[in-house]
A protein has these predicted regions:
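Short, surface-exposed alpha-helical recognition segments that flank or form part
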Residues: 20, 78-81, 174
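C-terminal cap of thioredoxin/glutaredoxin-like
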Residues: 8-14, 18, 25-41, 52, ...
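Structural alpha/beta surface segment adjacent to cysteine/selenocysteine redox centers
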Residues: 27-145
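Plant-biased recognition of short, low-complexity, intrinsically disordered N-terminal tails
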Residues: 1-5
């Protein structure tokens, strides 16, 4: 994300592929990084590394094709009116991001375990850059294009578009058990850390930030770290 500098800030973002706040929080983190690295008062500007860790908000979600997203939310969150309010609030949050997120709540929701396997595969194949491309592709698939996050065909298309695997190789991977144990271990690790909601961002392996904080909040923490004013 930047050339090597005197200060490296490591971010581990625990998230789920069907968590809208994870998408918003990720966009806010990227915006905070861009603004900080453009700040002439910080010289040299800090270097950031990002890695995603797995979490499932709802392990009971059925496999693809899953079930209607809105109907599931209505049962889980307390009815149609409450869900409509939640959806509208999230649409507004998305449009405030830079670049904007165009949340669309049609389509189905299904189990996210295979999406997490693909995210981990991206890290194995190409490190941070590949993983970020896959995460961004998955967020866009589910939240902006009403795609099925559990569909092997949809996931394989994300993998191919990100350049980590050809589509047929991605389908072969998804049909296997490769990285299943590693992802399940990641779920357990989040639980052992006491993470009960996402996004949850761990900075420099020591400092935890819960939720999709505002861009300015992330930026202030990063700025203090870069200036040596915050010791973790």
């Amino acid at each position: 994300m930047a050339s090597a500098t005197d200060t490296t800030i490591e971010l581990e973002i625990t998230s789920d592929s069907v968590c809208p706040f994870c998408y918003v929080g990720y966009r806010r983190i990227l915006q905070a990084i861009r603004e900080l690295q453009a700040d002439p008062s910080l010289s040299p500007s800090p270097h950031f590394t990002l890695r995603f860790a797995p979490f499932q908000l709802d392990p009971t979600l059925p496999p693809s094709p899953g079930e209607n997203k809105i109907e599931r939310y209505e049962r889980r969150f307390g009815g149609k009116e409450k869900v409509q309010t939640m959806v509208q609030a999230m649409v507004e949050r998305g449009r405030e991001c830079e670049p904007p997120i165009e949340f669309s709540y049609g389509g189905n929701v299904s189990n996210t375990k295979d999406s997490h396997r693909l995210i981990e595969k991206a890290w194995v194949v190409g490190g941070e850059e590949a993983q970020r491309k896959v995460v961004e592709g998955l967020f866009a698939l589910y939240f902006e294009h009403e795609g099925d996050i559990g569909s092997h065909d949809a996931l394989a298309t994300v993998a191919a578009d990100a350049g980590i695997l050809g589509k047929e190789d991605a389908l072969t991977f998804l049909k296997s058990d490769e990285l299943k144990d590693e992802v399940e271990e990641g779920f357990k690790k989040a639980q052992m850390r006491g993470i009960s909601g996402v996004p949850f961002t761990i900075i420099n392996q020591q400092f935890g930030v819960s939720g999709a904080q505002e861009t300015e909040t992330f930026k202030e923490v990063f700025r203090k770290l870069a200036k040596g004013e915050l010791q973790l």
